[in-house]
Design a protein with these regions (language model features):
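Short, cationic Gly/His-enriched loop motifs
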Residues: 38, 77-101, 106-197
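Short amphipathic alpha-helical linker/capping segments at the junctions of internal repeats
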Residues: 54-62
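Short cysteine/histidine-rich zinc-coordinating motifs and their immediately flanking basic loops
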Residues: 53-55, 179-180
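Short helix-coil boundary/hinge micro-motifs
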Residues: 1-47, 61-93, 97, 113-117
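Short, surface-exposed polybasic/aromatic micro-patch for ligand or macromolecular engagement
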Residues: 31-54, 190-200
Length: 200
């Protein structure tokens, strides 16, 4: 059998090996065949794996861009709970799809040129940012607010912590459908800096 990395327990320590999808990694310590410590060279992430996985290159770095070649999952927060995708993960991947999926932009050309900020490319950062925002969980009646990038800055093309807010679905629908001329925000709506909320 041909291995991606031809190493044995006798000579693996110190070797730089290749993974199938996360770049090169170095073997730091061999404890036994099921407990081998490694470190990915690009990100510095350390983990424990099996010797067989090292030979086959079947090890993954959660800090290597893996979602649309740009999103970094990290290792701190779940993407599913009891087999169900988390709201944070669905929001994050939906944002990446809108900006980096060619197929999506063919169907929705208004998203052409949209980007995600460097911080929002990290699921860990986005997850924690969401939990600090008013309206992330719900509007008080159990209805989730929508993530929006257009209300604070007219014509905005960047999803970031300084341009995104959670807004009621009704306002989001008006923003989507309205073609009327307006100011910086929706007609009759302004952002109250002190209260960190929208006022109509």
């Amino acid at each position: 059998m041909k291995y991606l990395n031809n190493v044995s327990y006798k000579d693996c320590v110190g070797k730089v090996c290749k993974s199938k999808s996360s770049g090169d990694f170095k073997v730091l310590k061999y404890n036994d065949a099921r407990n081998v410590e490694i470190q990915f060279l690009k990100t510095g992430f350390e983990t424990v794996t099996q010797l067989g996985n090292i030979r086959n290159g079947n090890v993954k770095d959660p800090y290597s861009p893996s979602v649309y070649g740009i999103g970094v999952l990290g290792n701190k927060h779940p993407i599913t709970i009891n087999g169900v995708l988390t709201r944070e993960y669905k929001l994050w991947t939906s944002m990446l799809v809108r900006c980096y999926s060619d197929n999506f932009k063919k169907r929705q050309p208004t998203y052409e040129g949209c980007e995600v900020s460097d911080k929002f490319k990290s699921y860990e950062y986005f997850y924690e940012w969401c939990h600090k925002q008013v309206g992330f969980d719900n509007d008080g009646n159990g209805n989730p607010f929508h993530l929006d990038k257009d209300l604070l800055i007219k014509g905005n093309k960047i999803y970031s912590e300084s341009t995104c807010v959670f807004i009621p679905s009704e306002i989001n629908l008006l923003l989507t459908k309205s073609t009327a001329s307006r100011g910086q925000h929706l007609i009759g709506v302004y952002w109250h800096n002190t209260n960190k909320a929208f006022v109509a």
